[in-house]
Structure formats: C-alpha cells, structure tokens
Amino acid sequence: HPDFTTSRLFVEATDEESGCKWTLYALREKTVVGTIVFTWEDSIGSLRYTSNDEDDQHGYITEALTSILSYLARTLLLTCVYGEAGSETVWRRNGFQLQANRYARELHH
C-alpha cells in the first residue's frame, strides 16, 4: 500500500498481516494526528481510525479517508467497506450508512 500526501497531510502506509495501517502526519505541525487501519478478513474490508480529535473537527480523518476510499475502490476493486468504532458523525460525513451495528459504504470504481 502506498504512502501519499494531501494538501495538509503526509500519510505513511505500513503493511500489516491482515491489511494496512496509515499514519497521518500534519504537514504544518509535523505531528501525528491520527491513524486509519484497514483490515481484510473473510472477504470483508473494514476501516478503523484513531485520532485525538474524535469528531474530526480539523478534517484530517476525512481528508485521508477520501484518498484511502478511492484507493480501495480503484486499486483493490472493493465494492463495499465497513467502518468500525469511531464517531458516527465522521462515518456519516464520509458517506457511510448504519447497517445492523456497523457503518457501511459502497465503493464505485
């Protein structure tokens, strides 16, 4: 999985046994502002994030998710991904809908 840069973030990818962990660094502050972890188990892709800014008031999680969701759709050809843990506000803001007890988002290539 690739590292990438957005207008405000450098995002470092670390491959893990069951997926990938992206560490988000704010370019200006040069500090870690969060992580997003993608796991792939039993043909199901799931995302989790951690942040000091739980509701993503600064928009860093949303900014990184935009690129990550595009990558998952175009490169891995996933059609759906689930959001687990984190804030309902963040998942809904990023196009996820509550299904059963987790958030789901369809992906289009």
State the predicted function of each range.
Residues Q57-R74, R93:
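Conserved acetyl-CoA-binding loop-helix of GNAT-fold acetyltransferases
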Residues H1-E54, Y71, T75-G86, L98-H109:
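GNAT-family acyltransferases
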Residues S87-N94:
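Acidic, divalent-metal-coordinating active-site segment for phosphoryl/phosphodiester hydrolysis
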